[in-house]
Amino acid sequence: MTSVSEHSGEHSVEAREGHVIDIHTTAGKLADLKRRTEETLHPVGEAAVDRVHAKGKLTARERVYALLDEGSFVELDALAKHRSTNFGLGDKRPLGDGVVTGYGTIDGREVCIFSQDATVFGGSLGEVYGEKIVKIQELAMKTGRPLIGINDGAGARIQEGVVSLGLYSKIFHNNILASGVIPQISLIMGAAAGGHVYSPALTDFIVMVDQTSQMFITGPDVIKTVTGEDVTQEELGGAHTHMDKSGTAHYVASGEQDAFDYVRDLLSYLPPNNYADPPQLSVPVPEGSIEDNLTEEDLELNTLIPDSPNQPYDMHEVITRILDDDEFLEVQAGYARNIIIGFGRVDGHTVGIVANQPTQFAGCLDINASEKAARFIRTCDCFNIPIVLLVDVPGFLPGTEQEYNGIIRRGAKLLYAYGEATVAKITVITRKAYGGAYCVMGSKEMGADVNVAWPTAQIAVMGASGAVGFVYRQQLAAAADNGEDVDALRLQLQQEYEDTLVNPYVAAERGYVDAVIPPSHTRGYIATSLRLLERKIVQPLPKKHGNIPL
């Protein structure tokens, strides 16, 4: 850090090189500004920067430069210093107070940003540090720009006392005020502990870095003292813990640059605020019918579904074939793998995809999948992104663990989120849509705008095996008493049930699906539906807010 001695009587400043700057001249004032600005680049000295680099990490400022378009960053409050004199802090007043704030562009689009500096008081939050974040939050809301937070800090600055807690509360409150107004994205680039974890939890997306990021409220030492448990930081709050187990993380990056690349991709699908439409690429409207514009990828969908309804297939194969350029930005890929969520485009239109995954639990919905999908649907609805559901769901996952942990209440979140959403909603039933899960996964009666089914769709109260056991219980028991072949009778009855009810045509006759289409026509139907629904208008009933079953 630059060593400076001020001689107030002589109105001069002595720089590290020994050159005295006369701050009463214009040239001297400019030189003094340059000195101060240079000091902001290494607020606690170059040795601290070297230690960060030795760990393979970037500094707070370097992270901002790496994420934003080159030369676009405009810094705010770079010269701010804390005001505390307690516990020797008066002798340590680094410029910036441990957080870099400002605004710039990503792919030419304006964003606001803050980046926490773990080299300054361990990244702990004090009064001025907190005020800087509050200020950039308010600027983002006022200007309708996405807010990106790069988090690398260790909780409250204990030396500053309760004022740190007050600023935490202001930050949390602003996160809540901004929710659904501007996209909020958090990158966790180090150990975020204590109060530092709640602000990211209130944002729309959290990106963590493998083997670098940790998030926890209480650390391993406290847990050991209180509960006797031995756990490492990585086990407790590492990136994969929060992806695979807690569902807190939305993406686990292989390194810092991968994290920045993901955020840039993510922003390409999001509008700047809730009054704007998501980015749309200019794609010519195809001439002729859907049939006239089929591609090889479209035709591949006709052979994707196995003949056996019990044989799984990878729903990713459907997703990539209906999206532009096979590009799908998946969200929370490692959590609740029985449901797939993410962003893509159809004929240039941004869409949010929610799809059952038959390779995991046969596509059944469980607690985690329900909450994962519900949160994503609400995010899409906040930012005017149409929702496309791809349905192959045999029901809710049975079991005492699910029941005891609240599948009724927590599964209802998905019902609520879908029914509440006012954006364009399109449903494609590829195979199974049974029972209550049919209702939850974008049924016409739950407010879907366009519902189509493939010929392979099985729309019914339950599958043939369960239905036959229930409907023909007495007949099967009588057959057993008479010494008849019960297994053969059961198979016959199952086939009759499937032929009569387990198909898409009963639902089509009643208008519960708008059309039964060849799988190859799916992309075309979605594209025409999106064009139709661009002007969709919904007038919700007046109320303060609903009461989602949290």
Where in the sequence are the language-model features?
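Ligand-binding clefts of soluble mixed alpha/beta catalytic domains
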Residues: 2-550
